[in-house]
Amino acid sequence: MTRGTNLVGPFLQHDAGLDYYGRRLATCSSDKTIKIFEIEGETHRLIETLKGHEGAVWCVAWAHPKFGTILASSSYDGKVLIWREQHQNATSPVAGSTWTKVFDFSLHTASVNMVSWAPHESGCLLACASSDGHVSVLEFRDNSWTHQIFHAHGMGVNSISWAPAASPGSLISSNPGPGQQRRFVTGGSDNLLKIWDYNPESKTYNLSQTLEGHSDWVRDVAWSPSILSKSYIASASQDKTVRIWTSDASNPGQWTSQQLEFDTVLWRVSWSPSGNILAVSGGDNKVSLWKENLKGQWEKVKDIEE
């Protein structure tokens, strides 16, 4: 995923995301549109332009294919839109498929900066982070959407990322934990990270932990998909640092952080699918890759110039 680095014509492209199979690429930009490309080998072909937002589109996110071909988008206009690809009848004279806007959520009173789908094991859940200070969680069940919305960060929420559905250590423990967890982390303009846990009895998301350390806005957060013995959260900040927060399965409420320093404001952090390599991108259009060594220190393994 990239954010705020490429120009498509005269408009700044804010985000890009590949679908689960790597066959479709969605991009979004300041021109209020979302573009869908088909990827074939080294080539890509524009197949659809989606129009529906009334402001710059900041974020696009594909749902897991078990829920269908579904894309979520969020914008400066305060809206979250859900798009679905409908395949034409095989006997139809019009071949191919069409994209339709199936839901239009106007829950927020300011820009929605990021949307993030939960691990598919938890259900069809979308978490949304807004400059109005609130987080909303949308859930699709039985052909209808329900939502929850709650206050998260006083000065606005910039980013959001779900924890893996299985708790750390559950794969290698003889006594696995209580099944699927619904948990995510948010990053705010109050310089804080906050971890939220779902309570199935009250059916609410409750603040379980606040992580302090950054001295400026937290621009992005990313929870590692790894479910071995530790949990990792990476955070990128306006303070020119990335922090990697670690919690051991033996002491799950305890988080320690390691700071990585950079020469530029940082925009984005992203884990590899296995959760052991971290990509960091910032204002200098460079991407660096980081890995933990055997001593538990994070080392840069590669620089990629865009």
From Swiss-Prot:
Main location: membrane
InterPro entries (UniProt xref): G-protein_beta_WD-40_rep, Sec13/Seh1_fam, WD40/YVTN_repeat-like_dom_sf, WD40_repeat_dom_sf, WD40_rpt
Keywords: Cytoplasmic vesicle, Endoplasmic reticulum, ER-Golgi transport, Membrane, mRNA transport, Nuclear pore complex, Nucleus, Protein transport, Repeat, Translocation, Transport, WD repeat
PROSITE patterns: WD_REPEATS_2, WD_REPEATS_REGION
Domain of life of the native organism: Eukaryota
Pfam family, one: WD40
Membrane topology: Peripheral membrane protein
GO biological process: COPII-coated vesicle budding; ERAD pathway; mRNA transport; nuclear pore localization; positive regulation of DNA-templated transcription; positive regulation of ER to Golgi vesicle-mediated transport; positive regulation of protein exit from endoplasmic reticulum; positive regulation of TOR signaling
Mapped WD repeat ranges: 2-47, 52-93, 107-148, 152-206, 213-255, 261-300
Assembly and interaction partners: The COPII coat is composed of at least 5 proteins: the sec23/24 complex, the sec13/31 complex, and the protein sar1. Component of the nuclear pore complex (NPC). NPC constitutes the exclusive means of nucleocytoplasmic transport. NPCs allow the passive diffusion of ions and small molecules and the active, nuclear transport receptor-mediated bidirectional transport of macromolecules such as proteins, RNAs, ribonucleoparticles (RNPs), and ribosomal subunits across the nuclear envelope. Due to its 8-fold rotational symmetry, all subunits are present with 8 copies or multiples thereof.
Cited function: Component of the coat protein complex II (COPII) which promotes the formation of transport vesicles from the endoplasmic reticulum (ER). The coat has two main functions, the physical deformation of the endoplasmic reticulum membrane into vesicles and the selection of cargo molecules. It also functions as a component of the nuclear pore complex (NPC). NPC components, collectively referred to as nucleoporins (NUPs), can play the role of both NPC structural components and of docking or interaction partners for transiently associated nuclear transport factors.
Protein name: Protein transport protein sec13
Organism: Aspergillus fumigatus (strain ATCC MYA-4609 / CBS 101355 / FGSC A1100 / Af293) (Neosartorya fumigata)
